[in-house]
């Protein structure tokens, strides 16, 4: 009997050791926790975007209360970088070298993200779902540890350009965007969508602004004076609201007014600008808008409202940035589910580059899909127009494979 008991005990020890050996952990991961790092502008000119980080913290709290991911709780550490690249460098180094996080999740901004891209790739730390759509975030060959999330800015503006060519072939176009890599990507994308011949013929004015500019009034007045009857604008929420209001106040009524999808928040952009000035603006979207009556009986939208009520009661439900933050958090949970018990940096990045899933708040027909050679998780969208109260979708899904 004694030898029999010893044999069973030995077998159990071997089985336990084998099971433990199946688990692989890199920095920031253990049997009980997955530690994520993030930089977000809680202060500075882009502070409206900080609601994304707040949403994700609330979402992970919900997931943790439900038992976590594969039994592990998600610990999100978010540091303020004020939308300042030097500050992003400082805070990211702190997250990697002191906190030893598993990933840098959804850091906000192209100029800020670029400031740490080489550092994170040299360290082989996943820069996961960067909160920007500059085309350079798809550079999987040179920067395999950095992956974007939303449709690329060039893909987005190509949709607007094609809409103009189809519906107003004699347009006089003005382009207004932020003077950084993101803004230039938007401007170049619009021109690329028009084609060289149409760009030379149709683009009559182009102007930029700095994220630190206290006002953009002079640029708007200059663009109106060009005689343009179609306007495309990329701006962070503060300047977007200023510009829309100024356009309305000086009586400029472009026949078409396209607004970059990064600044479509009703609460932080359109409401401050004035709904009367915002009516008729066109943009694009890939998610369900919980304020759109067509989704009032949708179970996934109802689940979002339940989440908001319990975990983020102070959040403004008219802020589309909250929906974005929620979807990114869902995608992050999907990555960690796929990781199983292998939570090394290598496997986290491998799973992020092998996604094929439809998340609950995505519009019908739009998927989250990546591959080792495709670092743009979302590549489809629909056009939407602001009716003075909410955004209304129109047209077909564009960019779906």
Model-identified regions with their sequence ranges:
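Short, low-complexity disordered leader/linker segments with a strong preference
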Residues: 1-35, 398-401
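Immediate post-signal peptide segment of exported/extracytoplasmic ligand-binding proteins
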Residues: 20-37, 65-73, 165-172, 342
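Beta-alpha junction/loop-to-helix N-cap segments that form part of ligand/metal-binding clefts
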Residues: 21-24, 33, 48-54, 66-139, ...
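Extracytoplasmic "Venus flytrap"
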Residues: 24-33, 37-57, 79-86, 108-109, ...
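Extracellular/periplasmic Venus flytrap/periplasmic-binding protein
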Residues: 86-90, 135-138, 143-250, 294-295, ...
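Segments of small-molecule ligand-sensing domains
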Residues: 310, 314-323, 333-391
């Amino acid at each position: 009997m004694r030898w029999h008991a010893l044999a069973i005990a030995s077998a159990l020890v071997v089985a336990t050791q084998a099971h433990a050996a199946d688990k692989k952990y890199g920095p920031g991961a253990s049997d009980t926790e997955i530690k994520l790092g993030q930089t977000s502008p809680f202060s500075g000119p882009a502070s409206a975007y900080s609601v994304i980080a707040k949403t994700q913290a609330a979402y992970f709290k919900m997931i943790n209360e439900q038992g976590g991911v594969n039994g592990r709780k998600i610990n999100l550490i978010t540091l303020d970088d004020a939308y300042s690249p030097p500050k992003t460098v400082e805070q990211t180094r702190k997250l990697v070298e002191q906190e030893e996080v598993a990933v840098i999740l959804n850091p906000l901004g192209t100029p800020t993200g670029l400031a740490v891209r080489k550092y994170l790739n040299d360290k082989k730390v996943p820069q996961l779902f960067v909160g920007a759509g500059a085309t350079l975030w798809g550079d999987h060959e040179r920067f395999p540890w950095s992956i974007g999330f939303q449709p690329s800015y060039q893909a987005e503006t190509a949709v607007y350009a094609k809409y103009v060519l189809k519906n107003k072939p004699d347009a006089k176009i003005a382009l207004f965007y932020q003077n950084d890599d993101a803004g230039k990507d938007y401007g170049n994308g619009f021109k690329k969508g028009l084609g060289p011949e149409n760009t030379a013929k149709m683009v009559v004015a182009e102007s930029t602004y700095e994220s630190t500019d206290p006002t953009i009034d002079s640029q708007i007045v200059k663009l109106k004076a060009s005689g343009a009857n179609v306007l495309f604008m990329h701006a962070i929420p503060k300047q977007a609201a200023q510009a829309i209001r100024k356009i309305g106040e000086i009586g400029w009524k472009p026949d078409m007014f396209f607004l970059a999808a990064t600044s479509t928040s009703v609460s932080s952009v359109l409401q401050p600008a004035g709904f009367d000035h915002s009516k008729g603006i066109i943009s694009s979207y890939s998610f369900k808008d919980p304020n759109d009556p067509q989704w009032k009986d949708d179970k996934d939208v109802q689940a979002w409202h339940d989440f908001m009520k319990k975990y983020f009661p102070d959040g403004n439900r008219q802020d589309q940035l909250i929906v974005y933050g929620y979807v990114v958090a869902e995608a992050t949970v999907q990555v960690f589910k796929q990781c199983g018990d292998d939570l090394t940096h290598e496997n986290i990045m491998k799973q992020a580059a092998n996604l094929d899933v439809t998340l609950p708040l995505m519009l019908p027909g739009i998927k989250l899909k990546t591959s080792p050679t495709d670092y743009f998780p979302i590549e489809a969208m629909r056009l939407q127009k602001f009716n003075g109260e909410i955004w209304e979708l129109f047209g077909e899904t564009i960019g779906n494979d």
